[in-house]
Structure formats: structure tokens, C-alpha cells
Amino acid sequence: MIFSSDNYSPVPQQVLDALAEANKGYQPSYGEDSQMTKVRHLIQKVFEAPEAAVYLVATGTAANSLALSTLCEPWQTIFCSPVSHIHEDECNAPEFFSGAKLTLVGNSDKINPKELKKSIQAEESRGVHGP
């Protein structure tokens, strides 16, 4: 198994078969096609959230970045570990999509609450010029 990227390996045969099947005939666009309707209903059922909006994206980077963009305003900060996936593997996509700033906390894989508090205070001390 190769875990270096979510789009590194070839597509499994069942995915190719599903794409070929989905390519038969015509479907409305912009998320109104029959496949998207099935996906939306399944996710709403699984999460017991009948009003949930569902958007499919092409990569994990897009999913992670868009999810982070819903959690903060463009002038805010996303605190993360220096070895976090969003820092090491997503390039600047989270900052691009959210407008927020990634701020590294500590120097290990787990964020220490004391280090986080110190980082928050450092950002707050910048006043209107900080996130």
C-alpha cells in the first residue's frame, strides 16, 4: 500500500466500471444527477441529517481545505502541529481556500495545551494586525 497521496495509485476496476455505467445516457448537471442524488440521500441517512448538504470534491486536499474554510473567518488562525497533515502535505491549499493563517504550535506531533495557550496569546498580542 502507498499512502503518499490519495490520487497516487491507479483506479480500481469497480470504479472504472461505475464510471462507465454513469456515462450511459444523459444526466442533469450541477449536482442534480441521479448518482449525486443517491450519494446525498445515503450520507443524509448515515449521519441522520436529512438537511445535510453534500458536495463531492476530487481530492483529500480539496476536502480538508474546504472543511477548514468553513470553521474560521479569513482573518483568523488555524493552529496545527508542525508535523500535521495540513501543514506537511497540503501545501498552501488550506490557507488559499480559507484565507486563514496556519500557525504551528510546538515541535512534536501532539499539541501541548500550554504551548497552544502561548501561541494563542502571541497571536492575540498582535491586535488588529494578527489573526
Protein language model annotation of sequence segments:
Residues 12-60, 82-87, 93:
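Conserved N-terminal alpha-helix of the aminotransferase class I/II PLP-enzyme fold
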